[in-house]
């Protein structure tokens, strides 16, 4: 609750984000092709394998939003485990826990391009998620969307607060009240910012 009380409560801007101006950065840890997406997939999955280019090829994700297990295979749609029929995302998308458009409306638009790109690629902001759940979440706040996995709701609220605190992003009153309501049911939750 202490970190939540430090967030500015206000009215968010109604500007369109520049999300399409950003892409996953190359991360030099594995190879020249290893991106932020690979870093997050490797962090969040078990039994990870890599292709010859250094990208994550496969793995198993205990998906936090739904609580389901997803068998990731790069380049496959994986519709049976919640993948997008039209995408070849392996059933997993990398979600900005505070959606980029929501962050942009909450103050990210005041930061320069490099700072926004840092946000876009910050592993602390990103989570491997079921494509279907991420597509339903879109750019909603915790008022509009919560994980169906009850066991993850405290973590989700804490992540939202920590990310907003780290980047100096505001919340509106409804969002503040919903975060406080969720946190009241999990008083031992630690918020990392």
Predicted segments, located by residue:
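Short helix-coil boundary/hinge micro-motifs
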Residues: 1-6, 10-12
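Betabetaalpha-Me/HNH-type nuclease active-site subdomain
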Residues: 10-129, 134-138
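Exposed alpha-helical structural elements
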Residues: 2-3, 36, 40, 155, ...
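C-terminal, well-folded lobe of enzymatic/effector domains
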Residues: 136-193
